Amino acid sequence: MENGMTLAYYGLGAGILAILFALYLFSSVLKEDMGNEKMREISQAIFEGAMAYLNRQYKTLIPFALVVFVLLVVGFGYKEGDFGYGLKVGVSFLVGAIASALAGYAGMTSTTKANARTTQAARKSLNAALNVAFRAGGVMGMSVAGLGLLGVSALYIIFKDVHVIDSFAFGASAIAFFARVGGGIYTKAADVGADLVGKVEAGIPEDDPRNPAVIADNVGDNVGDTAGMGADLFESYGATTMAAMLLGLTFAKNHGFSEVLGATFPLLLGAAGIVAAIISTFFVRTSEDGNPQMALNIGLWSTNFITAIFTYIIAQYVFGSEWAPKIFIAVVSGLVVNVAIGSLTEYYTSNLKPPAQKIAEASTTGPATNIISGIAVGMRSTYLPIIVIVAAIMVGYWAAGFYGIALAAMGMLATAAMVVAVDSFGPVADNAGGIAEMAELGPEIRNKTDKLDAVGNTTAAVAKGFAIGSAALTALALFSAYTDLAKTNPNLQKYLVNGKFDLNITDPWVLVGLFLGGTVAFLVAALTMESVGKAAFDMIEEVRRQFREIPGLMEGKARPDYARCVSISTAAAIRQMIAPGLLAVGAPLAIGFILGFKALTGYLAGVTATGVLLAIYMANAGGAWDNAKKYIEAGNLGGKGSDTHKAAVVGDTVGDPFKDTSGPAMNPLMKVAGTFALIIVPLLLF
């Protein structure tokens, strides 16, 4: 028992190591030159806008978190007859929520402090700019993995009870849903407003300082792709670790191991992934004429490879020679999903591949055919990723039952530090290009930042695929843990047959839950899509007003009111994220307590299956529309300004909320359902 608990300290140590490495990376970024006064001014405006949004978002969520904390303390205190137990559950929830918020702050601060420094570094060399942007992204990556592993390990060491700390994952999930949805609404409202009025109506280039929405657009890159994606993967990391620890107890008990060993092995996997990511960070570099994409790919591949080696060594140590190969195979199946989904996402969204090029060709006959082609590409893109995910589920289950499925998810998420680093590289590079344009640094610098931005677009698409795949496996791991934990509820014993739940697909209650789960996924997608439309309308009206009422703005003689546009996006995002958030949390609560365990189980299956398909479809359709436009802008099919290009801009505008708001909202929706069900299943009455 003591030896097993000692292993948890390795997780604690690795979490601390990740945070220390994040601080080292951040300090190295701050040592870089920020450039001239104009660059500093623009960077500061982006930083202030990003912080204003984050502060307002988290202040809005404080009352929600406190209410949930009180309900958890009272609910579990009453059920167990021990309010000390309820307090532990409530504290675990708050730790998860606070850790998620801290990761968001760390990443947002790093990326917004690095943008001008990346632009200035591009004056020296492409490699210098790559290093600054990647180190800034690394701060977010290490913060996500480090705070996640540190939080779970510390709570387990202190409370010594996995069931008590389930709520850590729910705390992370609750914050992640609002961060993902709010961030997606913010970034797309600003993006659509900047593009439609600036590029289409006014005919000015992207990132032109005359565009009133240009600062809000650059803030949005960080809000959506840094804070939003980071919160999403922090949620997956925490939830998967918790589910794997819970299932590890049962696996160890059934196979003659110490229960603590089964629970602490996922912490060791997380530690292995962090060490692998730190080592791989030093492999990311390129030459002046080199390929930045290859440099980042080497970082990802080496992280996967080193994690796999560490996994076998740890599995051999913890489980011995009989089980080590199967445990290793389960974990590696997750690593394979990581690589496979990334490659598939790149294929369906890259402007160098047939799907996006076919959408571009369809644009020659107008916006309608562009939209039809994009929808078809998105739908077609679902089947191969699903086959990959299903294969990992089967391999994981064959290897170690439900514990194997959770370990497959852990294998995928063990590399989260590097994946988040590579994803957060994108907004830094995008902002760096915007600053180069607004500070009028000339085409040579802009060409370098554009090269990094193009890589950032690809890594963002790959990271979206990773987020979807990890969310799917996380949801399944949570589902497995939920059914395992349900066996401990005396009120649900009547559904057990030979130690397993008898839940037939033809049972009306299960079917009701299935349909409700699928419906909620579509409803959240609709609400978030409408939210972008409403927020974008406000932004478009404001940008038009400024062009109309500010004398000399179009001629570049007057300065736009950037702060007004930032304020509009912030207010709209905070206001519009509340309804989808309440639905995501309220649906499983209502179904569980009104319709019962069978319906809640069906709901989890329905929201997961529908959510995964919607997420893949929307993310890939949006990415393909975006890159079809870029393919035309590269000089193909008439190039910029042609009717074909205008049709592609319409498709890209439709695709924006697909890939950056509604699609990504499915990830936390699935996980919120799973983590909340895990919390309430001991309290269900029937």
Curated annotation (Swiss-Prot):
Single annotated GO MF: diphosphate hydrolysis-driven proton transmembrane transporter activity
Segments spanning the bilayer are: 6-26, 58-78, 89-109, 139-159, 165-185, 231-251, 264-284, 294-314, 327-347, 386-406, 408-428, 459-479, 509-529, 577-597, 599-619, 666-686
Binding positions for substrate per the UniProt entry: K188, K659
Q: What is its main location?
A: membrane
Q: Which GO terms describe its biological process?
A: sodium ion transport
Site residues by UniProt (Important for potassium dependence)? A460
Print the keywords alphabetically. Answer: Calcium, Cell membrane, Hydrogen ion transport, Ion transport, Magnesium, Membrane, Metal-binding, Potassium, Translocase, Transmembrane, Transmembrane helix, Transport
Q: What is its EC number?
A: 7.1.3.1
Whether Translocase counts among this entry's keywords is: yes
Task: Give binding positions for Mg(2+) 1.
Answer: D191, D195
How does the protein's chain sit in the membrane according to the entry?
Multi-pass membrane protein
Q: Which NCBIfam families match?
A: PRK00733.2-1 (NF001953), PRK00733.3-4 (NF001959), PRK00733.3-5 (NF001960), V_PPase (TIGR01104)
What quaternary structure, including any partners, is listed in this protein's UniProt entry?
Answer: Homodimer.
Name of the protein this chain belongs to: K(+)-stimulated pyrophosphate-energized proton pump
The species is Carboxydothermus hydrogenoformans (strain ATCC BAA-161 / DSM 6008 / Z-2901)
The taxonomy runs: Bacteria, Bacillati, Bacillota, Clostridia, Thermoanaerobacterales
